[in-house]
């Protein structure tokens, strides 16, 4: 196997037992593909599919006027290039968008001859702005990065369920069905406790279902024929003869003696008819059975009975037979009657009873009844009734099942999946009711609504399309009204179309929808997880309050589709999920997961993606099944999942049809980063997966020594690490950019063969963490497409590195690690292991006020020169200035209203011309509790306002940087061109040239080197073809230079034009501060196994427990945190990390002793290739082996994949390899090498028992004490209660609540209590007085009436109760 440029620098030793057959798919594919399909920007118009924007346009257009004379047709659309790139949008606070323009055709027909076209106008119309997705799957909206989270909602289709006996006190199951369209009215069918079947539309008033059946044109006879089988009777003078159907009699009690055709009694009266009786009757050839009169009474007629002579209706279908009715029938000479066959077990009389409740006579009456239910109080005219009925379920404009809905309806009703319209059909309604009645009769199963075959994912593209369609339909209404005027007023299409509704719908969705979220950008993992999130909340989804336990629970169909571990703790648990590692969406929006095909117990290389519906048909084995070298399943019984319930059973290998592609396929990206996940309790694994997302990127990232092998995928797919777009040679590198000369075979003709990567330097993320990229390549390095060439935040050599590898000891230490506290060595802080940089953005705006414009200036009165020292002449702080709380960053003055002056002040002003007091100082200062270094300043100026010097210098720097990029590209393009020219010209004959080159002479290399390269074009070759080539190269270079000049001009224009600022703002200045945060007591830390704690003390190195060779521990954790939490994975990680560190030390010692490459290779082979995955070390050269060894000095990184990780014996083997006997003795290790004798740093004495010691990857979480620490002496008060505000953001006070008052009451501290409730809180006069007293040096208080008491009195008065206070 070939290693990439970065992989071979540090190979991760993997313990995986199973080879990967299927690579982890690109982790952001769902987001990016969905939005690409929505826009179809790159697809030529003719080849666009009917989805996304195209589908929305096709659905709304053509639009016809009310009189039908004018219509507007849609031709095509295109998206223009975005005016600003992503970075510029972030800086300026703009949306990264593209203008959507649609070409529409207005066709006007002749008024006299409507069939004839009078005129056609075609025009391109602006249709609003569509936000574009960045390359990493996010959106920049108003300058901030946002993510549109996918939504998991109930799929359109038909669903059958029951109420689980909760509705009625008897516990009877009430069955119901619901037809849910993608757009349109919901149709519900439900049984009531009396077994009458009702329907309701959009949860309105319920009505008997037969009304709906009559409204679609069925008569009562037809309704009964659809739902019942009939008994045929032939009437006789006394009683009747029943046509014998054997099955129908079984289980009934005979109400009379039943005889066969010979008159022999087979069943006596009052005996239950069993299978033997049926057989006897059958074998005797009984066709008819004589039944007495009372057997007929109470039965229900199946058809209308008409008098053969008169033609009048004697009895209606669904009438009960009575003695009178039977007499009438006999009199009319009716011989044959049909009745409904019903019984109590599996053929209930439900539809017959429902027909009795229904009072409507025919189709018209039924439709009027539905109209009255939908529009109560409106008079039902025939047209209105018809229009409403059609619009409910049969109109494509208002009702849409969608392809998914039609597929689901067809599969549930047992029809071929492709056929049927997108609106509801009569058969759909009838079939649904039939299945529902069958369910009530005990046949069939209800649906499981939590099954992933019944829930589908709506991605960004689909959500955006729905919004766009909503906006477009608003436009349609307006256009329809104005189309009538198009002919008379000679209007063009752009006069008719107003794009505002579209823009506002899109803006509202991206800006304030519940699914459009502020991107979590703490580290690369949190970014990628946010984009892979699936939420059941949001518009059209569930609400937190209504969601029960079942929806939140893990369902068997989640396997390989949705992660069972990663979900938030708290009210959203189970409603917000993460996609599993290999999951993807199919064309219908259902989640699919890959399985490897198994044929005759042998694994094949075919991988199929199955949705939850398809998977139910197959037997699927788990990835941990034993497989021999040829890929055969060797166990006698294999654990597999089968059936619709997906229950795990033991099956024989020949029955297995599929097998999982990888053990990690059931978990998400975050959970698959937890090593030894299989040894952790599920609750702690959940915390571990969630807390990795909160890890703050450290100043010096450190790859985890014990990983899972997925770290590189996450780092690369998140877009944090920079990948080479094309292979080539590194031409130039500095901290800001990398220039790569592209390989000839990858360069496209006529295009610059140069890739320039501008690295992100010290940029603020959404969570104020620092995003900074560092190059990893040197000039001359050969890189291939996809190689990592620069590390980003929290990445180390292209691998995700969220924390630091720490030497951890599990032991109590003087109570400092009680209750999950963490004891840290001073060395960790001194080495800046957990130091992180946070970037704060502070901004100030200068507005145009009523009294005059605010001004950003250095000239501020009443400020000492020392406070202005950091400001330049424009009044803006220098880059690099160290600032603390209260320092001025940007000087600003605001005009204030004229105040009344005393005569003395007037005199002074007249003498000295003092004008400064007309303005007040409103400068931007560093907020309290913050200090740092200014790293960047940006100045935005409104169009038409002259720029200050600082703003101009910022623009000049930006242009200089841009020019540098262009020069680099030009240099490489010219270099390539001249190299090609040199090859062409050497040894060619000429007709003349510069430096008196004689005719017929041959060009030499020396001659070309002697003259200026640009003079080569003056050479006149004898060969005309060569002369043409020379001219072509010259033109190509000039063309490129011209293009670059144009690009530079464009950039300059963009920078020098005025900035778009909010109304009333003249100038805006943004100052970026870099704040360095060291680890300190109160900071929250965690491992990857849900083992979290707070730093309690930072102890001097000399006091930390140390080993026999003097190595002190970095962190001391409490061993009691492990057993009750059951996250044993952390112990296994500690042991394996200890082995990794030991192996690194061994390699380091070999390099120190200058061992030969062959010796190093031997040790590496022992480490890498004696268990687990075999690495191809022979493919590396000696220098590469030594570079690899150099990178392994701090520890050999291990990969222990989830559910396929290192076993105990493998960990032991690694420990034995890392610590041979002499080293183990020197370090004081026990025989198992998993524990060590430690010594107390303060006394030097050995601890009583050996201590578990090893290396664990620990994270610093984004809950820093600096952000929470807060103190206040005086500050703002609430207006009404006059009590201090609360919270750090408001600079609030500490709440002295009810319980604290009880405490003081209990102690009898009455004076303390009095001042707490009065002068320290809301006694306005009292607190002013106290301040005066303190100033005077008197320490006494005079407590008055608290303001909140006055508020209480006012509230009581508002109830009409007057309270007067009498003072005694």
Curated annotation (Swiss-Prot):
Keywords: DNA-directed RNA polymerase, Nucleotidyltransferase, Transcription, Transferase. The RNAP catalytic core consists of 2 alpha, 1 beta, 1 beta' and 1 omega subunit. When a sigma factor is associated with the core the holoenzyme is formed, which can initiate transcription. The gene is rpoB. It is an enzyme of class 2 (transferase). DNA-dependent RNA polymerase catalyzes the transcription of DNA into RNA using the four ribonucleoside triphosphates as substrates. The keyword Nucleotidyltransferase applies. This is DNA-directed RNA polymerase subunit beta. Belongs to the RNA polymerase beta chain family. It comes from Cupriavidus necator (strain ATCC 17699 / DSM 428 / KCTC 22496 / NCIMB 10442 / H16 / Stanier 337) (Ralstonia eutropha).
């Amino acid at each position: 196997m070939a290693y990439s440029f970065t992989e071979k620098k540090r190979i991760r030793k993997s313990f995986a037992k199973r080879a990967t057959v299927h690579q982890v798919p690109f982790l952001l594919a769902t987001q990016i593909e969905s939005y690409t399909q929505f826009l179809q920007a790159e697809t030529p118009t003719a080849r666009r599919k009917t989805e996304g924007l195209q589908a929305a346009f096709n659905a709304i257009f053509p639009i016809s006027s009310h009189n039908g004379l004018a219509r507007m047709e849609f031709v095509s659309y295109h998206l223009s290039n975005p005016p600003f790139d992503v970075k510029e949008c972030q800086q300026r606070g703009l949306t990264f968008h593209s203008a959507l323009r649609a070409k529409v055709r207005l066709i006007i027909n002749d008024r006299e001859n409507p069939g004839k076209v009078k005129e056609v106008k075609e025009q391109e119309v602006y249709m609003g702005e569509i936000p574009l997705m960045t390359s990493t799957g996010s959106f920049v909206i108003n300058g901030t990065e946002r993510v549109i989270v996918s939504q998991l909602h109930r799929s359109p289709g038909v669903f059958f369920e029951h109420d689980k006996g909760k509705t009625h006190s008897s516990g009877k199951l009430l069955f119901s069905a619901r037809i849910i369209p993608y757009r349109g009215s919901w149709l519900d069918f439900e049984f009531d406790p009396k077994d009458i079947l009702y329907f309701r539309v959009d949860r309105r008033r319920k009505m008997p279902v037969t009304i709906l059946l009559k409204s679609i044109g069925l008569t009562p006879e037809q309704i009964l024929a659809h739902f019942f089988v009939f008994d045929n009777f032939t009437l006789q003078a006394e009683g009747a003869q029943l046509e014998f159907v054997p099955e129908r009699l079984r289980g009934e009690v005979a109400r009379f003696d039943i005889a066969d055709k010979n008159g022999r009694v087979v069943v006596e009266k009052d005996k239950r008819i069993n299978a033997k009786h049926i057989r006897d009757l059958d074998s005797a050839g009984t066709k008819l059975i004589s039944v007495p009169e009372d057997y007929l009474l109470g039965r229900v007629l199946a058809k209308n009975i008409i008098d053969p002579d008169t033609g009048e209706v004697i009895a209606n279908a669904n009438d009960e037979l009575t003695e009178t009715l039977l007499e009438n029938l006999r009199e009319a000479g009716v011989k044959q009657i049909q009745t409904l066959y019903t019984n109590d077990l599996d053929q209930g009389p439900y539809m017959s009873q429902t027909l009795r409740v229904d009072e409507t006579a025919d189709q018209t009456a039924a439709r009027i009844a539905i109209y009255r239910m939908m529009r109560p109080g409106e008079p039902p005219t025939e047209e209105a009734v018809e229009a409403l009925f059609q619009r409910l379920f049969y109109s494509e404009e208002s009702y849409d099942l969608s392809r998914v809905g039609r597929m689901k309806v067809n599969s549930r009703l047992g029809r071929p999946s492709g056929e049927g319209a997108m609106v509801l059909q009569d058969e759909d309604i009838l079939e649904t009711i039939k299945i529902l009645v069958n369910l009530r009769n005990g046949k069939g199963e209800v649906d499981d609504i939590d099954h992933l075959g019944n829930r589908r994912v709506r991605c960004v593209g689909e959500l955006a399309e729905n919004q766009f369609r909503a906006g477009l339909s608003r436009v349609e209404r307006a256009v329809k009204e104005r189309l009538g005027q198009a002919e008379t007023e000679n209007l063009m299409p752009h006069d008719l179309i107003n794009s505002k509704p579209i823009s506002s719908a899109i803006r509202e969705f991206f800006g304030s929808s519940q699914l459009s979220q502020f991107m979590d950008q703490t580290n690369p993992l949190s970014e990628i997880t946010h984009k892979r999130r699936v939420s059941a909340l949001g518009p059209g989804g569930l609400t937190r309050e209504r969601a029960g336990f079942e929806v939140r629970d893990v369902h068997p169909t989640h396997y390989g589709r949705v992660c069972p571990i990663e979900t938030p703790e708290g009210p959203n648990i189970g409603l917000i999920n993460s996609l599993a590692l290999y999951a993807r969406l199919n064309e219908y929006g259902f989640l699919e997961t890959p399985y490897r095909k198994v044929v005759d117990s042998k694994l094949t290389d075919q991988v199929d993606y199955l949705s939850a519906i398809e998977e139910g048909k197959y037997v699927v084995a788990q990835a941990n099944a034993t497989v021999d070298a040829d890929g055969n399943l060797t166990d006698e019984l294999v654990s597999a999942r089968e059936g619709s319930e997906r229950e795990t059973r033991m099956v024989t290998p020949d029955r297995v049809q599929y097998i999982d592609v990888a053990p990690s396929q059931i978990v998400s990206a975050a959970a698959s980063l937890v090593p030894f996940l299989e040894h952790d309790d599920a609750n702690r694994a959940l915390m571990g997966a969630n807390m990795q997302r909160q890890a703050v990127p450290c100043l010096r990232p450190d790859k985890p020594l014990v990983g899972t092998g997925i770290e590189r995928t996450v780092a690369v797919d998140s877009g944090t690490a920079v990948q080479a777009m094309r292979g080539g040679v590194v031409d130039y590198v500095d901290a800001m950019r990398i220039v790569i000369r592209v390989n000839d075979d990858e360069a496209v003709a006529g295009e610059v063969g140069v890739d320039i990567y501008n690295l992100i330097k010290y940029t603020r993320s959404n969570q104020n963490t620092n995003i900074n990229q560092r190059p990893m390549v040197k000039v001359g390095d050969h890189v291939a497409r996809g190689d990592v060439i620069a590390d980003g935040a929290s990445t180390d050599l292209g691998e995700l590195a969220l924390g630091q590898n720490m030497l951890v000891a599990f032991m109590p230490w003087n109570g400092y690690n009680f209750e999950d506290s963490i004891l840290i060595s001073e060395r960790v802080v001194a080495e800046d292991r957990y130091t992180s940089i946070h970037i704060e953005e502070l901004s100030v705006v200068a507005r145009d006020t009523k009294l005059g414009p605010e001004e950003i200036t250095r000239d501020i009165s009443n400020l000492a020169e020392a406070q202005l020292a950091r400001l330049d002449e424009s009044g803006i702080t220098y880059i690099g200035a160290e600032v603390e709380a209260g320092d001025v960053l940007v000087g600003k003055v605001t005009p204030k209203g004229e105040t009344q002056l005393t005569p003395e002040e007037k005199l002074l002003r007249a003498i000295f011309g003092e004008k400064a007091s007309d303005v007040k100082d409103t400068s931007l200062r560093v907020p309290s509790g913050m200090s740092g270094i200014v790293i960047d300043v940006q100045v935005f100026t409104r169009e038409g306002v002259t720029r200050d010097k600082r703003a101009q210098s910022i623009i000049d720097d930006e242009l200089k940087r841009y020019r540098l990029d262009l020069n680099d590209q030009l240099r490489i393009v010219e270099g390539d061109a001249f190299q090609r020219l040199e090859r062409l010209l050497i040894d060619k004959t000429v007709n003349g040239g510069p430096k008196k080159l004689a005719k017929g002479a041959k060009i030499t290399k020396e001659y070309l080197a002697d003259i200026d390269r640009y003079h080569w074009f003056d050479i006149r070759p004898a060969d005309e073809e060569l002369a043409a080539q020379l001219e072509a190269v010259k033109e190509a270079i000039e063309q490129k230079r011209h293009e670059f000049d144009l690009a530079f001009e464009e950039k300059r224009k963009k920078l020098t034009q005025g900035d778009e600022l909010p109304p009333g703002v003249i100038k805006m200045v943004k100052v970026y501060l870099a704040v360095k945060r060291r680890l300190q007591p109160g900071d929250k830390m965690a491992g990857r196994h849900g083992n979290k704690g707070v730093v309690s003390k930072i102890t001097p190195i000399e006091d930390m427990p140390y080993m026999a060779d003097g190595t002190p521990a970095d962190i001391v954790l409490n061993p009691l945190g492990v057993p009750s939490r059951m996250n044993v994975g952390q112990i296994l990680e500690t042991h394996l990390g200890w082995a990794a560190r030991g192996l690194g030390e061994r390699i380091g010692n070999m390099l120190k002793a200058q061992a030969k490459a062959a010796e190093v290779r031997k040790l590496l082979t022992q480490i890498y290739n004696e268990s687990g995955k075999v690495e191809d070390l022979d493919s590396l050269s000696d220098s590469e082996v030594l570079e690899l060894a150099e990178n392994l000095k701090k520890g050999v990184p291990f990969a222990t994949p989830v559910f396929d990780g290192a076993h105990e014996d493998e960990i032991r083997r690694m420990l034995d390899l890392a610590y041979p006997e002499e080293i183990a003795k020197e370090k004081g290790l026990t025989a198992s090498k998993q524990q060590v004798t430690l010594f107390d740093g303060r006394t030097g004495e050995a601890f009583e028992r050996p201590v578990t010691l090893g290396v664990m990857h620990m994270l610093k979480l984004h809950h820093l004490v600096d952000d929470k620490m807060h103190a206040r002496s005086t500050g703002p008060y609430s207006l009404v209660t006059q009590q201090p505000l609360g919270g750090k953001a408001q600079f609030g006070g500490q709440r002295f609540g009810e319980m604290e008052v009880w405490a003081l009451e209990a102690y009898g501290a009455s004076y303390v209590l009095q001042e707490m409730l009065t002068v320290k809180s809301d006694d306005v006069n009292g607190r002013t007085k106290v301040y005066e007293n303190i100033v005077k040096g008197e320490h006494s208080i005079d407590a008055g009436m608290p303001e909140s008491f006055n508020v209480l009195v006012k509230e009581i008065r508002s109830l009409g109760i007057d309270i007067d206070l009498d003072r005694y």
